[in-house]
């Protein structure tokens, strides 16, 4: 019998970035009738997260409005200029002792599905690993490749490191420190790793393609993160 611990996992959707590469606010872009922020919240909700928060900037207010429409708790990042780690800190600071882990799903991964999130949450609860990470596995001319994906699940044991003001390199640095002890879930579905942060990538997913599926990676194995 497999014993699964009920680790309280809170989904966190960072939506406070400047969207410079896209040229417009990614959170409010639509795909199949739902905004990117709605798709992220839906995936986390269907995937078994206990609660969900969306972190938005002070302006533009259109992002806040879209986030409020999802039914998730909406938090404000007063200064997102230092990158995604600032949104992560806002979320962790708000959650206090109410979360055992966070499932970090950036708003520009709109193809992630609830069943994908559930696989990751189940793995995190089963292993109690400090990190639970998804990778997309694929093959080009018989050579195996990996591409990083989301959501990444960070346990409470790592919160102090993520909150450390001296941290350089953001959450990526924390991932590298603890990668050997991470639980890795391998997916064959490219949607787990489809980052839609440029106009061409948005056009690709609207046409039903993943933005990178026809482009060989620069290295034979691209490892998380």
Task: Identify the function of each model-found stretch.
Residues 89-91, 157-162:
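Short beta-strand and adjoining strand-loop segment in the mid-core
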Residues 19, 29, 159-160, 203:
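Nucleotide phosphate-binding site architecture
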Residues 2-148, 180-187, 212:
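Nucleotide and nucleotide-moiety/phosphate-recognizing core
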Residues 31-34, 165, 169:
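Residues at alpha-helix boundaries and the short loops/turns that link adjacent helices
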């Amino acid at each position: 019998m497999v014993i699964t611990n009920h680790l309280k996992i809170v989904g966190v959707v960072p939506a406070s970035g400047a969207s410079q590469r896209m040229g417009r606010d990614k959170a409010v872009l639509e795909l199949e009738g739902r905004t990117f922020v709605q798709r992220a919240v839906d995936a986390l909700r269907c995937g078994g997260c206990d609660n969900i928060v969306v972190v938005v900037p002070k302006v533009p207010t259109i992002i806040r409005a879209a986030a409020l429409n999802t039914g998730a708790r909406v938090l404000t990042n007063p200064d997102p200029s230092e990158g995604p780690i600032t949104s992560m800190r806002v979320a962790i600071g708000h959650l206090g002792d109410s979360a055992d882990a966070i499932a970090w799903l950036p708003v520009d991964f709109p193809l992630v599905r609830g069943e994908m999130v559930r696989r990751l949450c189940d793995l995190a609860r089963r292993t109690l690993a400090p990190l639970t990470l998804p990778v997309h596995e694929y093959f080009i001319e018989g050579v195996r490749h990996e591409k990083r994906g989301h959501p990444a699940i960070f346990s409470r044991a790592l919160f102090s490191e993520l909150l450390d003001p001296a941290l350089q390199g953001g959450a990526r640095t924390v991932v590298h420190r603890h990668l050997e002890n991470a639980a890795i879930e391998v997916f064959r579905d490219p949607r787990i790793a489809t980052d839609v942060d440029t106009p061409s990538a948005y056009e690709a997913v609207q046409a039903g393609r993943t933005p990178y599926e026809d482009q060989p990676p620069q290295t034979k194995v691209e490892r998380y993160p």
